[in-house]
Amino acid sequence: MYNKNAAAPLPPMGWNSYDYYNTAVTEADVRANADYMAEHLAPYGWQYVVVDIQWSDPNAGALVPDVQYVPFTQFCVDDWSRQIPAPNRFPSSAGGAGFKPLADYVHSLGLKFGIHIMRGIPRICAHNHTPILGCDVTADKIANPFSISKWNGDMYGVDMTKPGAQAYYDSIFALYASWGVDFVKVDDIANTNMYAENPYSAQKEIEAIARAIERSGRAMVLSLSPGPAVIEKAWHLEQHANMWRITDDFWDDWRLLRAMFERCEVWQKHVGAGCWPDCDMLPLGRLGKGFGAERGTNFTEAEQRTMLTLWCIFRSPLMIGAELTKLDDATLALLTNREVLRVLTDGRAAAQVRRDEASCVWKSYGAGTAESVVSPPAAEKHAAGGLLAAASKRNAADARGAAGVDLALHHGLAKDVADGHGVWGIVAVLDDELVVGVPNHDVCFFVSFHTVVGQ
């Protein structure tokens, strides 16, 4: 039996084309970023190369910056109502090869390949009554014109009560399996925000997609967007998906980062193997070329540290949004810090300790578990813990300055510390308190090793 959790036992780490290229990434761009990842990032656990939205549109980006998505575009589809790569942008896909040559190249580097799709069936296929593989049904018979995206006009939702609906999803994921796809980001599905009264209106399509992946015979990470995901449906997301966005598009804006602490608190009990609430891409480095104006991130170095540390201690998937070939040394060093990445891969029982207008504190356990620290067995056990404290300025979310907060945190285990150090930030252990000084918008990250002796 297919175990969807086995597809993502750890939070996926990789690169996504959207933040830099918008809709207009090409095969050459993808290969260049894959080459960079293989050489500079793969040794640290980064492995997914994901082609984001509009890869089947030969004219994608033609109207930027005025219009993001070309209206009524004639994107590329095969004879069975399935989108295929635009060969003018992905030359190796010509002749029906699809993404297989590009996926093979990414795999040859020791990496994994992913794509973005929109929920539903192409409108042009519904309008042209094109057939669906495996059944005597045409696209118009399963298309639901009353289930559409608020922001992209390419697709109709699929009416899962209609004959042929599951066959359609089975056919597209069978195609992706034949290409060698390892990761699929499905958009307009975690929150169908066109319909405020029912933001989880695509529940049946989520189930159909999960079923199609199982039937494809290939393990694929299933990532659902956009957010915010519906917390009341956490049980359903955990059953069917590997990742789901807990926020709308996250960009390099301190207000969005500050709000992420609350979002992580809401979702902290739903993190585990194969189930990763997703804080969205990391907008650092060079961004925005495909949006009409290439630029550097608006986040300060302090804010970038805060972002990465929160993502890691919460155990969000990590998807770099930058153009990798233009990473500077400081950004590369941040993304390859083994100690903060170890909390992502090895952390357990991460939880918010406290949060107020001035600061937020999270704690995670490493080699041991929260339970082993609280109620240890008779033998000694070593547990590596990470603690994060991020500061902002009270009632001034956009303020940046040297002043911050000083926290005296009851560590509870300070007297058992055999070794400990700050990865970044100023930390001191006095008696049984952990004393932390944090500048505005910055973070303190402390790793300690405890010898826990049984009662």
List PLM regions with ranges.
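N-terminal module-boundary/linker segments of secreted carbohydrate-active enzymes
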Residues: M1-R31, Y36
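Conserved, mostly hydrophobic/aromatic
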Residues: W15, V49, V106, L222, ...
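Aromatic-lined carbohydrate-binding/catalytic grooves of carbohydrate-active enzymes
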Residues: M37-N198
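Aromatic-lined carbohydrate-recognition surfaces of secreted/lumenal glycan-active proteins
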Residues: L111-A126, A210-I231
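Glycan-recognition surfaces
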Residues: K141-S147, M155, D159-T161, A167, ...
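Glycan-recognition and catalytic regions of carbohydrate-active enzymes
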Residues: R295, S316-A378, A384-G386, R394
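Short linear motifs in low-complexity or flexible loops
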Residues: A379, A383, A389-S392, A396-A403, ...
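C-terminal beta-strand-rich structural cap/linker in extracellular carbohydrate-active enzymes
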Residues: L430, L434-G454
